[in-house]
């Protein structure tokens, strides 16, 4: 009873404990910021970068592939890694001509066929300005039937294509490498049905994740995934990359949430797997081939996905730890103490916080007293406000008294909670403002997860700054190396070391971002030769002309 009486006198800042001091002695307990405020927005908008508009030719009949390839090679070489130097344009692909454009206009209309240099230029480049293709054509289908006709024609002509959603990826998977035709799914953004009893959403692939989140939340449900880029990314792209995100610790991967898919194969065949059944044991579950295949086996056009119930009680805490071992122990304690209400466990090192404070507008450091080494963001969601609050209070009390938490802040309103999430979600945005950023998305056993950050700092020295952050709850490290410019010298210190080190830990070189172009020829660090060969066989079976998102996912040497 004394604890609950003291709860009315809560302070926002917990403050570090003195030797032998307890939180009970201070009368400090966390504050829950209210069921009514559950649906606060975590989305942050990324200011559009000033991209140079490369002047592409409008005469699509001229075969200037070599010039295009040279231009593309130079951009890739300066941008991200040595991998692009080994990718040559497949000479088996046809070159776009005026007859092709005329055909596409016959099925899409003039508005669905974009040749404007400025618009195509934007679609040719990723949001970080690191990956750039030289496509001269952007197609905007509005139905599965139109996607089918496009692919059937491109397959017969052997025109390579790249499917594109919100273009928020980090590994060059959603932009052309050379002159591939870009197929944007943005016009396919309809919500088809929603089952209010079972929480099953059926929609088209071009739906923006944030729009879907708003829709299902109004129905009393939430999307099973949440990403910093949810205001731009498409659900089709999320599924094609098997995006993980911030709710993975609670709801798992999309392999468990996606119930059905509609996919258009390379030859235009529409594969209808759009079931909404929770159980279906009739033969092979083919949808799993396309979840995470990055558009290399087929283009996802419709999705049926299970959405969890929206829970009324939400708490967000921003904590500091003195060392990484404390972060590990805090995670274990959170799993044991918070159990079923734990919905996010994110960690950041102090370099991330410093970067966020410097480059993100409108944020402030929740713990400005001392420069701690590590920070942890914990979110809980549950159905009983008083029960959830009591569990979080007890957990934080024990964690501070055990020395796992050095300091902490509990969000008391939407603004504070949004600020906490803005810091975590804005790290990627802030990192690109430094100049050059080498991004690695690794899955590593939690006890060894931060070791590679420290080793990378030793290797890089004063050439750059190394950041470590990510989803500690599922062993996903985002390793960022920042520098003022890209250089071969820096790259030599990073690769192949980062892949070799991860492989020795039996980790994955791609936890959630996919392989794309960046890591297609690095797949052997995470997969056996037998597994890669089987993947190659599947690719050749479903896409024998290899027109779907070429140069991505699998090494060119095996195709």
From Swiss-Prot:
Covalent S-S links between cysteines: none
What cofactor does this protein call for? Answer: FAD
Q: How is the cofactor bound?
A: Binds 1 FAD per monomer.
Q: Which Pfam families match?
A: FAD-oxidase_C (PF02913), FAD_binding_4 (PF01565)
Provide a GO biological process annotation: alternative respiration
Q: What is its main location?
A: mitochondrion
Q: What does this protein do?
A: Catalyzes the oxidation of D-2-hydroxyglutarate to alpha-ketoglutarate.
Q: Which family does it belong to?
A: Belongs to the FAD-binding oxidoreductase/transferase type 4 family.
Q: What is this protein called?
A: Probable D-2-hydroxyglutarate dehydrogenase, mitochondrial
Q: Supply the gene name.
A: D2HGDH
């Amino acid at each position: 009873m004394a604890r609950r009486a003291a709860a009315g006198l809560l302070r926002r800042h917990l403050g570090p404990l003195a030797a032998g001091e307890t939180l009970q002695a201070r009368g400090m307990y966390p504050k829950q910021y209210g069921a009514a405020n559950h649906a606060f927005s975590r989305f942050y908008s990324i200011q559009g970068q000033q991209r140079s508009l490369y002047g592409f030719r409008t005469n699509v009949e001229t075969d200037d592939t070599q010039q295009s390839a040279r231009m593309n090679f130079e951009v890739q070489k300066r941008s991200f890694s040595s991998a692009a130097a080994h990718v040559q344009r497949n000479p088996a692909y046809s070159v776009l001509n005026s007859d092709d454009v005329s055909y596409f206009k016959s099925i899409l209309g003039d508005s669905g066929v974009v040749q404007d240099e400025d618009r195509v230029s934007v679609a040719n480049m990723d949001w970080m300005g690191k990956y750039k293709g030289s496509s001269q054509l952007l197609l905007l289908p509005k139905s599965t039937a139109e996607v089918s006709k496009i692919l059937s024609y491109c397959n017969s002509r052997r025109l390579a294509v790249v499917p594109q959603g919100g273009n928020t990826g980090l590994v060059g998977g959603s932009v052309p490498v050379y002159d591939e035709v870009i197929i944007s799914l943005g016009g396919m953004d309809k919500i088809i049905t929603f089952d209010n009893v079972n929480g099953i959403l059926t929609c088209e692939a071009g739906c923006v994740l944030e729009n879907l989140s708003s829709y299902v939340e109004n129905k009393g449900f939430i999307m099973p995934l949440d990403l910093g880029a949810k205001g731009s990314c498409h659900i089709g792209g999320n599924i094609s990359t098997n995006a993980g995100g911030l709710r993975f610790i609670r709801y798992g991967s999309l392999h468990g949430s996606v119930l059905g898919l509609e996919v258009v194969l390379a030859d235009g065949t529409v594969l209808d797997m759009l079931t909404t059944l929770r159980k279906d044991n009739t033969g092979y579950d083919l949808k799993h081939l396309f979840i995470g295949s990055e558009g290399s086996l087929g283009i996802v056009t419709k999705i049926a996905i299970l959405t969890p119930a929206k829970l009324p009680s939400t708490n967000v805490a921003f904590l500091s730890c003195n060392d990484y071992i404390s972060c590990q122990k805090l995670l274990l304690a959170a799993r044991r103490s918070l159990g079923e209400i734990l919905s996010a466990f994110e960690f950041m090192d102090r370099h991330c916080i410093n970067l966020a404070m410097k480059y993100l507008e409108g944020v402030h450091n929740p713990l400005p007293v001392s420069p701690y080494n590590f920070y942890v963001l914990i979110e809980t969601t549950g159905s009983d406000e008083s029960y959830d609050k009591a569990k979080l209070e007890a957990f934080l009390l024990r964690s501070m008294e055990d020395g796992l938490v050095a300091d902490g802040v509990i969000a008391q309103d939407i603004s504070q909670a949004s600020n906490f999430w803005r810091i975590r979600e804005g790290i990627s945005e802030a990192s690109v403002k430094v100049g050059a950023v080498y991004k690695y998305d690794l899955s590593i056993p939690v006890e060894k997860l931060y070791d590679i950050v420290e080793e990378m700092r030793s290797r890089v020295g004063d050439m750059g700054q190394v950041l470590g952050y990510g989803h500690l709850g599922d062993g996903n490290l985002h390793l960022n190396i920042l520098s003022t410019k890209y250089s071969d010298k820096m790259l030599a210190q990073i690769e192949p070391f980062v892949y070799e080190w991860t492989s020795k830990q039996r980790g994955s070189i791609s936890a959630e971002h996919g392989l794309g172009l960046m890591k297609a020829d690095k797949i052997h660090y995470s997969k056996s030769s037998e597994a890669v060969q089987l993947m190659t066989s599947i690719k050749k079976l479903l896409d024998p002309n290899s027109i779907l998102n070429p140069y991505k996912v699998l090494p060119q040497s095996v195709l």
